[in-house]
């Protein structure tokens, strides 16, 4: 499926940490989904996991942008969308006037070649700003301290070595550059045994078919390269690399919800977060309904 303004992808080198089973499964999924789009189905129906959540991701990135502006770290310059998948994150970033270039890095070649162009066209991305990359987010073929923003949307929890991944982020980010991460995190009281139980769950038949895995094969979330972390484990990983990290958790009132929706709640919550940040507080609230999806804003110290 040709999209006129879509740039040819660049191919970056890959580390041994790239999960090959997940990579081949993602390629299989991409080919299936593109065939369904060609047959007449809407991309939103075919790949609802990321595409249907476009507005939510856009809102979360805008919250991060407002917060960064408040702490004098505006969203601008060169960005990397890590584990870009459908390209939704790169699409959102392309609409920020002060973002000049986005590297959309995804290790599934078929997602880069076939799915990203459809996503960019559907959501009216600024094609000129986005350079698609077939590559591994553990090895970015970029100079040291050359990037201003790194974006993660549900990708870092696939890292086989979070310490290694954050080392690479730290290498390419300029001083005072920032990571915006929208990712899954569990309450701190969760034990490692509890998290391991989640990872040992078998993929259902529909997912096995989608990813080209034989239905009768035993295949768990762990086998697919998933990992689970508590909020504090994420925070510790950032702090070990000298990032100053703020965490936003989603919250909504149980009553009078319609009244809340009439208020400028995004600006109210980001302003409150800024005031708490000045007082040394690093955990904040934002309006939302997904209790396990957190927004991390991590600024690299000089």
Where are these regions (language model features)?
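N-terminal, positively charged/glycine-rich alpha-helical extensions of SAM-dependent methyltransferases
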Residues: 1-46
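Conserved alpha-helix/loop element of class I SAM-dependent methyltransferases that forms part
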Residues: 55-75
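Class I SAM-dependent methyltransferase SAM/SAH-binding core
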Residues: 86-139
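A short acidic, Gly/Pro-enriched loop at the edge of an enzyme's catalytic core
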Residues: 138-149
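A short glycine-rich, Lys/Arg-flanked "PGG" loop and its adjoining helix->strand segment in the class I
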Residues: 163-175
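Conserved class I S-adenosyl-L-methionine
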Residues: 180-208
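Acceptor-substrate binding/catalytic loop of class I
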Residues: 217-233
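A C-terminal cap/extension of S-adenosyl-L-methionine-dependent methyltransferases
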Residues: 232-236, 245-302
């Amino acid at each position: 499926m040709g999209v006129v303004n879509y740039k040819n992808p660049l191919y970056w080198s890959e580390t041994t940490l790239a999960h090959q089973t997940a990579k081949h499964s993602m390629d299989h999924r991409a080919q299936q989904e593109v065939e369904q789009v060609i047959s007449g189905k809407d991309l939103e129906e075919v790949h609802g996991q990321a595409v249907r959540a476009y507005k939510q991701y856009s809102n979360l990135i805008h919250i991060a942008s407002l917060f960064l502006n408040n702490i004098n770290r505006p969203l601008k310059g060169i960005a990397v969308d890590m584990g870009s998948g459908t390209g939704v994150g790169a699409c959102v970033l392309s609409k920020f006037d002060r973002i000049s270039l986005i590297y959309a890095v995804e290790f599934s070649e078929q997602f880069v070649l076939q799915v990203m162009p459809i996503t960019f066209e559907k959501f009216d991305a600024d094609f000129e700003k986005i350079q698609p990359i077939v590559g591994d987010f553990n090895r970015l073929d970029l100079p040291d301290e050359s990037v201003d923003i790194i974006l993660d949307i549900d990708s870092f929890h696939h890292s086989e070595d979070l310490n290694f991944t954050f080392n690479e982020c730290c290498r390419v980010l300029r001083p005072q550059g920032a990571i915006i991460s929208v990712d899954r995190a569990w309450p701190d009281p969760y034990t490692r045994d509890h998290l391991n139980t989640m990872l040992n769950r078998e993929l259902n038949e529909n997912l096995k078919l989608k990813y080209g895995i034989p239905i009768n094969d035993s295949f768990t979330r762990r086998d697919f390269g998933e990992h689970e972390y508590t909020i504090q484990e994420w925070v510790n990983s950032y702090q070990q690399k000298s990032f100053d990290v703020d965490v936003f958790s989603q919250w909504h009132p149980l009553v009078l919800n319609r009244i809340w929706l009439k208020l400028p709640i995004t600006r109210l919550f980001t302003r409150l977060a800024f005031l708490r940040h000045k007082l040394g507080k690093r955990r904040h609230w934002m309006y939302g309904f997904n209790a396990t999806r957190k927004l991390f804003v991590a600024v690299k110290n000089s």
